[in-house]
Amino acid sequence: MNQKYSLQNPKSSWRLIPLLRVSGQLQMAIDQWLLEQHQTGKHPPVLRFYTWASPTISLGYHQRRWPTSWQQLTWQETPVELVRRPTGGRAVLHQGDLTYMVVTSGLTGKRLDAYQAICEFLIQGWRSLGVELHYGSAGREYAHNPSCFGTATGADLLSADGYKLIGSAQLQRGNTILQHGSIRLSRDTTLFTQVFGEPAPPPVELPIKQEGDALFQTVIQALTEAACCCFGIELVTQPLSDAEWQEILAQPSLERRYSNN
């Protein structure tokens, strides 16, 4: 990792929030709240992982065009939730994936440098699991593709055979950064085709012979260990408290802020 953009600080402690499974609207509210708390100096840097309570399509903050049919989609008789991320990028179908989130500060340089400084722990963590990743290089066609996983930019991570495993998006507020991304572990290919009108990308071949929660925990363990090593930090596990939940749920216009409207 380029030292200019290094996150390493031997005396730094980050908060690790245990795996959380709630609605997409609440996940976006939590990410936004953590960003604002860190920006105002009330909260340390944080790493967390989460899954989605039901299949969800998350739109990029500036994404204004998407099929109207997305608002009536169902999967196994469950409505597909449609939410808006605080970060940019294209639409992501969250179903069978694991999402990571980092909130930190102190990175300088161009946005891509910040992406790659944070993504280093993803590269190292997956390497420890036997998967080599490299960055994508999509051109202008990215802006015309409604699906985040339809192309790969310099902020995305691909497997050795060229298939996108992790799609990331970022929001910078002054010196503070929120970066989160979808790690494609398993997915219903029929639902992907229903959403985007095209075949699902081929699955990334993983050497890990696990599924479901066991797979999630194996990946989380590898990535948390890599984060400690790459960033030179100590991770302190701390779930969200009742008081913090109250603050998150009390955010003004929570439903309007993170809905697709």
Where are these regions (language model features)?
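Active-site loop/lid in soluble adenylation, ligation, and acyl-transfer enzymes
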Residues: 7-73, 84-85, 148, 158, ...
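A glycine-rich, hydrophobic loop/mini-helix early in the fold
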Residues: 49-51, 65-110
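Short acidic-glycine loop/turn motifs at beta-strand connectors
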Residues: 53, 159-162, 173-174, 187
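Short beta-strand-to-loop capping motifs
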Residues: 61, 102-106, 159, 185
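Internal, conserved structured core segments that host functional sites
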Residues: 95-154
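Long, positively charged amphipathic alpha-helical accessory segments at protein N-termini or as interdomain linkers
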Residues: 109, 120-141, 172-261
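Aromatic/basic-lined ligand-recognition segments
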Residues: 151-158, 162-170
